[in-house]
């Protein structure tokens, strides 16, 4: 084929691009494949050239570039043998890049078109659907998608002891997200009629969410691990923040009793900041070790710094109070029992 700017025929250009890819010169290979597609966008190698361009960008870590080309394959070549795999890869990238609304839309279209998806492809569809539904506050549909994904995982025995396949990370992350948003719907201001029951329910959901996020980390994917680690730290930090806003009870009717209540609350729940910092320390250390540089790592560093400052403020506030830890604990026990501390 002769063009205005090249005398290289398409098969030869395709071979050159393939050689570049095999030599791990992925960016160069991607550009050559894309040139082959551009020169002959309706030719016999058009769909494969565009797909290979996407794949080269994908392995080179250029996710947005890869995503746009996978999506283009699906749009331009819906009858191609590459359509199915292009859709699944686009789904994984949409989920990875947190484009959850688009991921949900593509998941529904893909599931409607292909009724015989393989297990891992089904997991890509279901995790994308679940995350899009969580983002839309649709608990019912999110839980349904996660349940179907977990059924596949169990049926195929995909989750054994230790490391799990990378395809499971978004499923478990979605489960963590669902449990997280349910936990954070439980508030303590105004003080609920049964404060103890509300706190117990939120703590249980927090622990359940942490368990799911921990399962996501078992894929040993630094991106998903950073996201999950940040979320766990955030769960503890937010719970502490909200508990510190709980107003003093009516029994705290003097300045001394209000000080006792404030100090007792700070003392009892300071452990939440310790747990948050521990998880964020772990997340930042993982990022340093693996070279992960996603926005979630920056958020983890910033959150850790904020928690260090909050911990110092808590310690200073406790030090200013003219009471021992034993006195504060006794006061909190009295308030919790509905009694007035002396």
Q: Where in this protein do the model-derived segments appear?
A:
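Acidic, polar-rich low-complexity tracts and alpha-helical solenoid repeat scaffolds
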Residues: 1-342
